[in-house]
Swiss-Prot record:
The UniProt record lists the keyword Ion transport: no
Keywords recorded for this protein, A-Z: Coiled coil, Endosome, Protein transport, Transport
Top-level taxonomic group: Eukaryota
InterPro entries to which the protein is assigned, alphabetical: Snf7_fam
Similarity-based family: Belongs to the SNF7 family.
Gene label: VPS32.1
Organism of this sequence: Arabidopsis thaliana (Mouse-ear cress)
Record's protein name: Vacuolar protein sorting-associated protein 32 homolog 1
Subunit structure: Component of the endosomal sorting required for transport complex III (ESCRT-III), composed at least of VPS2, VPS20, VPS24 and VPS32. Interacts with SKD1. Interacts with BRO1/ALIX.
Length: 213
């Protein structure tokens, strides 16, 4: 019943947070009361010691009775705190569960919306369009890369013209005069070039002429 009340309400998250805050405030209040009672119990023990030293047994026993009452209240407050802790843990767990379910529900709704916006037929159609555009682009690129005016010439005519050029070149080579070969031994011998005397040779000749005198 508690989980059913927790789900499906628009302001449930705010209410849960407020409840947790209230429980936390109550827990702090109980802890403060527990500390006060513990101090009172400790004070009764000190009083009992003083009365015991004063040989006032009856007063000392009364102090111990009050100490027992304070301890019972402390134990009761401890049980209250334990229950509040349990309740807070349950609420926090329920809050986490609610947030998880809401997140899953939101994700499922988003997935459902995307599936409605995109189905298998749309995917197939899109892929066909992409393939068609790709093929068209290939044809355009092939047309642009072909040599300009390449289909305007006849291959047979070009080959005939090439044969004609080769025949004319061969005929021109046949009509060129044959060079006359002169034997090496029949060539007229050249007179050896007269060597010009150097400056040292001139000085040597002049010295020899002086010595002859």
């Amino acid at each position: 019943m508690f989980m059913n009340r927790l789900f499906g309400k628009p302001k449930q998250e705010t209410s849960t947070l407020q409840t947790l805050d209230k429980l936390n405030e109550t827990l702090e209040m109980l802890e403060k009361k527990e500390n006060v009672l513990l101090k009172k119990a400790t004070g009764e023990v000190e009083k009992a010691k003083e009365f015991s030293r004063a040989k006032n047994k009856r007063a000392a026993i009364q102090c111990l009775k009050r100490k027992r009452l304070y301890e019972q209240q402390v134990e009761q407050l401890g049980n209250f705190q334990l229950r509040i802790h349990d309740q807070m843990i349950m609420l926090e767990g329920a809050k986490a569960t609610t947030e998880t379910v809401d997140a899953l529900r939101t994700g499922a709704s988003a997935m459902k919306a995307m599936q409605k916006a995109t189905n298998i037929d749309d995917v197939d159609k899109t892929m066909d369009e992409i393939n068609e555009q790709t093929e068209n682009m290939k044809q355009i690129q092939e047309a642009l890369s072909a040599p300009f005016g390449a289909n305007d010439f006849d291959e047979d005519e070009l080959e005939a013209e090439l044969d004609e050029l080769e025949g004319a070149e061969l005929e021109e080579q046949l009509l060129q005069p044959v060079p006359i070969h002169v034997p090496q031994g029949n060539k007229p011998a050249r007179a050896p070039a007269q060597k010009q005397p150097t400056a040292e040779e001139d000085e040597l000749a002049a010295l020899q002429a002086e010595m002859a005198l």
